[in-house]
Amino acid sequence: MLRVAVPNKGSLSETATSILKEAGYATRGDSKSLTIADEDNGVEFYFLRPKDIAIYIASGHLDIGITGRDLAADTREEVDELLALGFGASTFRYAAPKDENWTVEQLAGKRIATSYPNLVRKDLANRGLEAQVIRLDGAVEISIRLGVADVIADVVSTGRTLRQQGLKPFGDPLCVSEAVIVGRKGAEVTAEQSVLIKRIQGILHAHNYVMLDYNVARENLDKVAAITPGLSAPTVSPLANDSWVAVRAMVPKTQANSLMDELSALGAEAILATDIRIARI
């Protein structure tokens, strides 16, 4: 059976589990369950700490897994990123008290608190800087107030937690992260792995696209096709009135309203947008 690692808790867990369920896979009924065997699909899921998933994949004990790009990088394990999943977006930044003006160069010789010590050490080494990296397992933001650290390095999603603690980020992001599927470094993607990846891709396409249907005068077909090209080309079907055609195309969900406005301005009629439940592109 294909062995797949899934985050057991945290911000990645709920969305990852939801996508797998939409993709037709069995999900655990008890949040404390560590494994579940989906016999119908030939997959066994292991629910693990997100920080540990890349370790299990790199060692070959599991085949593929869902984790954060930043979490995988911090393990220093060699894994291949097979698919970016588009959720769990964040950046990894240095941060300091908002009334202090820090630059990255000033980190030399300072104390940096973080839950991602390897990412920080790698960044410092790349910059030719030496600093004391203090590993904490959580609540990193409070370490400056308690005198444990001079600055912190932490995951930033909305920045609200930093602001609540009177901190602000500085310097470029050390890592731009999102949820990803990872596999063992250099390993060929198997047929079983490909099926799971394509199923998940189909769900992501369904989340991100809508199907746009409309009727338009044949003389305007080239114009409307230019703004709704679909993924390959729009589907064009004849109507009872030979001077008109029906057009169908997938469009990004975020652009649907503006595209409908443009189509209407070009004389299109009966413009409908419908959700896509599952797709194979």
Swiss-Prot record:
GO CC field: cytoplasm
What exactly does this protein do? Catalyzes the condensation of ATP and 5-phosphoribose 1-diphosphate to form N'-(5'-phosphoribosyl)-ATP (PR-ATP). Has a crucial role in the pathway because the rate of histidine biosynthesis seems to be controlled primarily by regulation of HisG enzymatic activity.
Q: Which SUPFAM superfamilies does this chain map to? A: GlnB-like (SSF54913), Periplasmic binding protein-like II (SSF53850)
Q: GO terms for biological process? A: L-histidine biosynthetic process
What this protein is called in its record is: ATP phosphoribosyltransferase
Q: Where does the protein end up?
A: Cytoplasm
Q: In which pathway does it act?
A: Amino-acid biosynthesis; L-histidine biosynthesis; L-histidine from 5-phospho-alpha-D-ribose 1-diphosphate: step 1/9
A molecular function annotated in GO for this UniProt entry is:
ATP binding
Q: Which organism is it from?
A: Corynebacterium jeikeium (strain K411)
Q: Family, per the entry?
A: Belongs to the ATP phosphoribosyltransferase family. Long subfamily.
